[in-house]
Structures are given as structure tokens and as C-alpha cells.
């Protein structure tokens, strides 16, 4: 972009792909005080000043280090100098497990954004984080879909706190060292969290593997780009199928047909729907999901099953997914619409899909 530095131009290009619906309300910026999030804050501030947008900086303090309070307050002073509203979200007493800390952090951020009538949270994930995620997932045996890494735009990973909140990662195309060089040029320092160098954490071990020599010989980010292209194609196919065959009604999520899906795609789509119907944060995975999808697609005598907290029943013209106990969770239709929007590759589908709760009367029979 004319007149902008490379980091600012990359940041603004990433946000330019988002719909106004997400940007017209206060935009949350997650800022820990580390280099990545601090660069994110500066870039977002300059973008917002030019575009007339409103930012809300959010710092989560888990209270696990003596320095954390001072670091959060330092972010607050910087925000005050820039005229940005800043909230410190204190989560003292949280369980020290990484998974629990992550969930608590995302829940607090999502609640605060929703309280400010916002829909979008910006995070400082970089190209380095993407490469580390690739190695972590490869080590865990993830398939190609998972190896595509983090999405530029996704739904909040927590539920129900994250209902209506999206996460954008506008720095995924920028290396960490480039952001640190940007901060040095601005005369800004940053806080270093010792846990980022603790080999007890898997991400730190993967980071150490990504030495310059490996990056030259194993183009991890090039592999991620290729898998992302494949994922876009796969997501588009699932989105088109969902648009034609899936509706949320009062009795459950209704699916007209899985016909024509390759087995792997059918399992992936079914997992997404089971996650939504059960109101869970993760979909079921593995052999049980694959077998269930195969049974639904290939067997004309399918009568029902349970998986992932859901009961799957066969009706005359469709199958129905609903929680094993009780009604569908509140917000199910909106969550289904938002999931479809992410899959479409066009976030404007969020507005077009919102509120679709009716059940198609002309669903095509599956059996």
C-alpha cells in the first residue's frame, strides 16, 4: 500500500479482507506486552486512526509471575498515551495447565468483547507461530487438514462465552524478527515471558527446531501454504453441501443427505455438526467418527447412534442431530451460520446466513 511500511501494509491488507460488520463495532486487541502483541497494537492503532475505527486493548493477567501485573500496567500506560481504552483481565487462581490457561484467557477476552458490543478480537500470531503449530500437529499425527495450521479468521474456540466473537490473525504472514525490527525502529521495548524459553512446553521445543538451517532446508511455511490451499478447496465443498442440506430447527440439526461425499470429508463435516449440536468446544475425532460417517453414508438401514454428546436418529426424509440430554444449546443456529461463513472463505456470508433457524420442508430423502 502506498506510503505504508511493509508490516503496516501487510496488516492492513489482512484486515481489508474482513467485512465491515466485524469492524464497525469496537475491535478487541489482545496485548500481553510481548513483541508480537505490542507490534499488533501499534499497527492496529495506526490503522484505526486512519479508518475511524474504535479499538479496545485487552491484557490478560494470569498472576503466575511476579512481573505480570507490572507488565499489564505498562501496556495500560502505552495505551493511555495513544488514546486507546485498555482493560486488564485478572485471572488469578486459574489452574496452571496450559489448556486451562488458554481456555480461561479466551473466555475472558470473549466476554469482554461481547460486553463492549464487539465481534472481533485481533491476536498477534505470527508466521513463526504458524510454523511451530505445523510441527506440533505433525508430531501428533495430524492429517493434511490440520497441517494447514491456524486460519486468518476463525470462531472463538470457547463456548458459550465465545458466541458471536471471531478471531482475526493479521500477522500470520509476518516473521517475528521483522516485527521486532519494527518495534526497534519505533524505539519501543517489550516484555519477555520466561515461559517462552521453557523447554517443558512443546511449542518451545518446536521453536528450537525451527533454527535458520532447518528453515532453509525444510520450507515449513511453504508446506503450510500448500495445505491451506487444499483446505480452502475442502472447506468450499463442505460449505456448499451444508448450504444445500443442513438446517437448524427447534428439534435438532437436520441433515438431508451425505451422499456424494468422500469418506474423509463426510466424517469431517459430521464432526463439525456434532460439535455444534452438542454445544462443545471440540468435535469428536478418530475411528468412531469415521465409522459413524461411513455407516450413515453407505448403509440404507441406519437407524441411529450416539457420539460426541449427541444422539443421531434417522427420520423419513433426513437424519437429526441433537444433544443426548435436553434441547439444542442456545445460539445453535447462529453458530451453524458462522461456521458456514468461515468455511465459505467469504466472511460476508456471516451476515447473509445469520438467523437461519427454519427447517427446509423439501429436504431430499436420504434413504
From Swiss-Prot:
GO cellular component: cytoplasm
Upper lineage: Bacteria, Pseudomonadati, Pseudomonadota, Alphaproteobacteria, Hyphomonadales
Organism listed in the record: Hyphomonas neptunium (strain ATCC 15444)
Major place of residence: cytoplasm
Pfam families: ATP_bind_3
Keywords in alphabetical order: ATP-binding, Cytoplasm, Ligase, Nucleotide-binding, tRNA processing
Annotated catalysed reactions: cytidine(34) in tRNA(Ile2) + L-lysine + ATP = lysidine(34) in tRNA(Ile2) + AMP + diphosphate + H(+)
Enzyme class: ligase
Domain notes per entry: The N-terminal region contains the highly conserved SGGXDS motif, predicted to be a P-loop motif involved in ATP binding.
Name recorded for this polypeptide: tRNA(Ile)-lysidine synthase
Localization terms from the record: Cytoplasm
Gene: tilS
GO MF annotations in UniProt: ATP binding; tRNA(Ile)-lysidine synthase activity
